[in-house]
Curated annotation (Swiss-Prot):
Pfam families in the cross-refs: Phycobilisome
Modified residues (N4-methylasparagine): 73
Biological function: Light-harvesting photosynthetic bile pigment-protein from the phycobiliprotein complex (phycobilisome, PBS). Phycocyanin is the major phycobiliprotein in the PBS rod.
Residues that coordinate or bind (2R,3E)-phycocyanobilin 1: 83
Protein's name in the database: C-phycocyanin-3 beta subunit
Bilayer topology: Peripheral membrane protein
Any one annotated GO CC term: plasma membrane-derived thylakoid membrane
GO biological process, one term: photosynthesis
């Protein structure tokens, strides 16, 4: 079940029959304080999604030209488009996780069973993982640009964003 950070904390406390701890409350208060930065990051990535995906795919195919060569897994424009579509879907679900402050939407809706699907299709998961890392590099560069974004330290949010991409890459590798 997909949960945001608030629902997850409440569900965990309820399952244990406990009140929310000071640490849990502090973490949720911090999440609220950081909300504008989170929205800014999601907006930046979403607004640049097509170029992020396009550049990640170009870079992946430049580094691994065997993928688009005859006999390669992304050979033919239809197969290459499917690869780009998959990168786009993963990026979209990463933005949902960033907004929610929780990876469950990414896990449940995008990553659960993806490795097995790629294995069944003969898709090289390691190549998909490289593509995801390229999405990460571009997304973080855009998110880290200090111009026109809520002021303040974004290092923990950027680390969180990085973690969602790493989680996605590990799920397919």
């Amino acid at each position: 079940m997909v949960q945001d950070a608030f629902s997850k904390v409440v569900s965990q406390a309820d399952a244990r029959g406990e009140y929310l701890s000071d640490g849990q409350l502090d973490a949720l208060i911090n999440l609220v304080k950081e909300g504008n930065k989170r929205v800014d990051v999601v907006n930046r990535i979403s607004s640049n999604a097509s170029s992020i995906v396009r550049n990640a795919a170009r870079s992946l195919f430049a580094e691994q030209p065997q993928l688009i060569a005859p006999g390669g897994n992304a050979y033919t424009s239809r197969r290459a488009a499917a690869c780009v579509r998959d990168l786009e879907i993963i990026l979209r679900y990463v933005t949902y996780a960033i907004f929610a402050g929780d990876a469950s939407v990414l896990d449940d809706r995008a990553l659960n069973g993806l490795r097995e699907t790629y294995l069944a299709l003969g898709t090289p998961g390691a190549s998909v993982a490289v593509g995801i890392q390229k999405l990460k590099e571009s997304s973080i560069a855009i998110a880290n640009d200090p111009n026109g974004i809520t002021r303040g330290d974004c290092s923990s949010l950027i680390a969180e964003v990085s973690g969602y991409f790493d989680r996605a890459a590990a799920a397919v590798a």
